[in-house]
Amino acid sequence: MFCHLHCMLVVFSLLLTLTGSFVNAQTTEVVTEITATTADPPDPCASNPCTIASTHCVAAGESHTCECRPGYFETNGNCTVAQQFAGSFSVTQVGGSNVLYSADLADTDSAAFASLAADVEDALDTVYQASTMADIYLGSEVWGVPEWLYRGRLHVLFATEDAGQPVLVNSTDATEAFTTALAAEAANLGITIDDSTITVSDFDECASADDNDCDPNANCTNTAGSFTCECDTELYDNSPNTEEPGRVCIAPCDPGLCTRPNEICNNGGTIEDDNLCKCIEGYDYTQYGDCDPMARSTDFRCYHCEDSIDNVKCNGRMESENGTARQCPNPTDTCYQTIQMNPEGDGFMIRKGCMNLEDCYDLLYSYEADPAKASCFEYIFPYGQDTPPGPGVQCHYCCSEYFPLDLCNYDSIHFIYGTPRINSWDPRMNWDLSMNLDATEEPESGSQRHLPVCGVLSLVVTTLLALMLH
């Protein structure tokens, strides 16, 4: 459960510089300057090595330990959420005589306090472990005996499955067991305990930041047996576990940024990997920049091309699909029937994003590339062959960062024996050799022409066919 990591040694360098060494008739002087620099030691917790949600990393020199988060307690090697009670009692007599307070009891490091605490904790363990609460009892701890009153303060823990569980132990049951334990211990020690001073009440985890794991910018609310956290109203809740909100609160974006529905700041509004905004969990960007619900494995929809006001475009996208819609080679054309818009089986689905050309080529033959997500799909090779002469097509979304989004998918044409180029994200496959290439928009003078993938492949296939005929 608890792990240790030996990290890099502290770098300590000595620079020995002979700044002056000369001899003359009167004196001989050797000046030696030593400059020592010590590099900052690496943070062993920087990589977030504690992956279990109930733990957090605690640096220990060049190593680290994974300890239970505040509000969790270690039991049998696991960190468990505990229902906590605060108990107290007063001792009035010892050996039949009234109590004279011992200053040693105020010192939690003293032998007197350690002895009394151990006796009381053992008695509580014996009673609770013999009760109906044995399965969930975690332990007790004597916190102190304040000088102003011979009154012990205790902490009693009961396990729950998670912080949202209802109260499993009420204070009445806990008090009865507590009273029984103290009575037995009082008889063994020859002390008298004032029953009217025995209390067991819900522990307030919000009283100290050490007892809860709420974000510093969240409001902690004590509940029966637990606590809840809620981010301040002006902050966004970015907690990794949706069932435990208020653990990570981030600042909102500057006004005017990340304003689309279901869109939030990424990393608290700081730019990292050129992605300032992101969709909330369960949503993803569409080709129009909207955050729509992500696809389910059964969601798919083919494309149908039809005339539009500005030009012939492909539409009919499913809500969870994203990318750049390509132009259609013909005024109307139905999509290739065996291609589906789903992440499994035939067809593929992509994520929004562009990468530069060098990165694109490095990832051409990878089944998964970030930010592209794709899978191979089945297709019919031209001329009626059952299989293509090359390997299966791996469709990745690659494009040049220098081209606008609407031309993004037409950069870096790549094909294998007439099969679709790697960065063609459109699931539609059309091998019609009579496509109307004039349906695409003409580029501005001096710019590179980017043809639709089917048009490019038609030229390739036509050229190959012409060569074969000759």
Curated annotation (Swiss-Prot):
Query: Where's the SEA domain?
Result: 81-205
Positions of GPI-anchor amidated glycine lipidation: G446
Q: Tissue range of expression?
A: Sperm.
EGF-like domain span: 41-80, 202-250, 249-292
What the entry lists under PROSITE patterns is as follows:
ASX_HYDROXYL, EGF_2, EGF_3, EGF_CA, SEA
Task: Extract the InterPro entries matched here.
Answer: EGF-like_Ca-bd_dom, EGF-like_dom, EGF-type_Asp/Asn_hydroxyl_site, EGF_Ca-bd_CS, Growth_fac_rcpt_cys_sf, NOTCH1_EGF-like, SEA_dom, SEA_dom_sf
* Predominant localisation class: membrane
Example GO CC term: the record gives: plasma membrane
Q: Which residue numbers fall in the propeptide? A: 447-470
What are the annotated disulfide bridges?
C45-C57, C50-C66, C68-C79, C206-C220, C214-C229, C231-C249, C253-C265, C258-C277, C279-C291
- One GO molecular function term? calcium ion binding
Q: Which UniProt keywords apply?
A: Cell membrane, Cell projection, Cilium, Disulfide bond, EGF-like domain, Flagellum, Glycoprotein, GPI-anchor, Lipoprotein, Membrane, Repeat, Signal
Query: Which superkingdom does the taxonomy of this entry point to?
Result: Eukaryota
Q: Where is the signal peptide?
A: 1-25
Instruction: Indicate where this protein resides in the cell.
Output: Cell projection, Cilium, Flagellum membrane
Stated membrane topology is:
Lipid-anchor; GPI-anchor
Q: Which residues are glycosylated?
A: N78, N170, N219, N322
Task: Supply the name of the protein.
Answer: 63 kDa sperm flagellar membrane protein
